[in-house]
Amino acid sequence: MLTSGFELLLPEGVLDYFEITNVEQTKGDTSIYLQEKNIIPEEYTDRRLESKGFYEDSKVQDFPLRGRVVYLIVRHRRWLDKDTGDIVIRHWELVAKGTRMTQEFATFLKGISRY
């Protein structure tokens, strides 16, 4: 996991599910790349799941920082159910219901649940 202070800019709770893999800065913006950790979703712990990569990145605009636009580039993980052959994902609505979260984290989950 990349740790260079950028984790302080993320909504509280994000690093429970994601790790920072890269940060890119240009003159006008900062992009923080987040990859979902290989933690089996709670609702699927009784199944035999195997990580099968990621969906296409989703891009969420976060609050500006010192005049720069901040983007969170999110890679969502997918798992294969070895018994059924189904692909499963983490259901962010369930994460939201099961956690005490800050308004920032709630906004983040709302942004990524569209993808």
Regions found by a protein language model. Give the residues of each.
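Generic detector of short, locally flexible boundary/turn motifs and exposed helical patches
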Residues: 1, 9, 43-48, 55, ...
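Short helix-coil boundary/hinge micro-motifs
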Residues: 1-41
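Intrinsically disordered, low-complexity segments enriched in small/polar residues
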Residues: 3, 11, 26, 51-55, ...
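Residue-identity detector for threonine
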Residues: 3, 21, 26, 30, ...
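Intrinsic disorder/low-structure terminal segments
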Residues: 5, 17, 53, 62, ...
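N-terminal juxtadomain amphipathic helix
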Residues: 31-80
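Short, positively charged, Gly/Tyr-enriched micro-motifs
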Residues: 59-115
